[in-house]
Amino acid sequence: MLIDGKKIAAELRQEIKLEISQLKNKYKKVPGLTVILVGDLPASQIYVRNKEKSAIEVGLKSEIIKYPKSVTEEEILNKVEELNKDNTVSGILVQLPLPEHINKKKVIEAISPDKDVDGFHPMNVGNLSSGFKSSIPCTPLGCYHLIKKVEPNLDGKKAIIIGRSNLNGKPMAQLLLKENCTVTITHSKTKNLKKECMEGDIIVAAVGTVSYTHLRAHET
């Protein structure tokens, strides 16, 4: 089955745009997203620009705060604390990766859980696995929406997750468990990965490797 991701994304943006418009009318306030970007990695800059474009498109107030690669950890932590206290900022996103001299874990934990757009804060991770309301990492959430659009009822489906990262594989598994799927998480040490995949109704690949496993001839 081919899924038209662009069409589904456009529909979701319209739904979000309407929701934001309703929030504006109700609270007389424009929700705001602030992104902290450190360094000049081309991939990060493109990713952040796309986020800004999408945010503006749905009616969010968007701000990008840029720092050189030489910025200190203390400066980043101070800015995060400032944004935590700023009532005009609804969401905070620190673009990863960060330079090696900055402790990623420390920065993530400094973000207020209520403003943690990426869903990386330990409190949001715990809430997701416990079935409570939480922010959810965007990649697994996007995959979840795609799956639900083409198959609304997932009861009893066997889902195979390839990858066990905290950013993608694990939250993806939690989302599908909430939909009553039978979930198997596979990884680089899994024996006979192809066999596991062939038994699945749903396969989500969350690994940064091309042609990680072949399911059928000319397919991955």
Predicted regions and their residues:
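Short, well-structured alpha-helical segments in soluble
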Residues: 75-86
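Anion-binding alpha/beta catalytic cores of soluble intermediary-metabolism enzymes, centered on
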Residues: 93-154, 172, 211
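Glycine-rich phosphate/diphosphate-binding loop of Rossmann-like nucleotide-binding domains
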Residues: 44-50, 137-212
